[in-house]
């Protein structure tokens, strides 16, 4: 079995709180697990209701915020332990595309239209399928 491209193990992110802050804590993500294989040119979509942790997950995967507990591994390397040079290389390979709610939920667009835009713009396919 090959090593996964991205592996998220028991990821938890808690905002707020702190020893002396007196602020309440907010659990934005709790014990989240995801494995993305090493297939070339694949697109993975995370969808969910508002406030379900999608943006927090993206920020954790991209290394923009620190994980409270758990691990995020890219090609077997812990994202939290990467130095600046490794982070720059990592961010060249992993990107988040945030949704445009007006385009995604436009009743005049079919799902195929939305995916075709991504596939064509990033040249992910050689032919129409």
Language model region names:
Residues 1-129:
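ABC transporter nucleotide-binding domains
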């Amino acid at each position: 079995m090959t090593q996964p491209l991205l592996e998220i193990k028991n990821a938890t992110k808690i905002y707020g709180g702190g020893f002396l802050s007196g602020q309440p804590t907010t659990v934005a993500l709790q014990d989240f697990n995801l494995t993305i294989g090493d297939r070339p040119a694949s697109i993975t979509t995370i969808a969910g209701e508002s406030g379900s942790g999608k943006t927090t997950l993206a920020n954790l995967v991209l290394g923009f915020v620190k994980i409270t507990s758990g691990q995020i591994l890219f090609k077997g390397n812990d994202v939290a332990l990467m130095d600046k040079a490794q982070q720059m290389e990592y961010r060249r390979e992993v990107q988040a595309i945030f949704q445009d709610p007006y385009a995604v939920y436009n009743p005049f667009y079919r799902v195929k239209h939305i995916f075709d835009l991504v596939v064509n713009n990033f040249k992910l396919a050689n032919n129409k399928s």
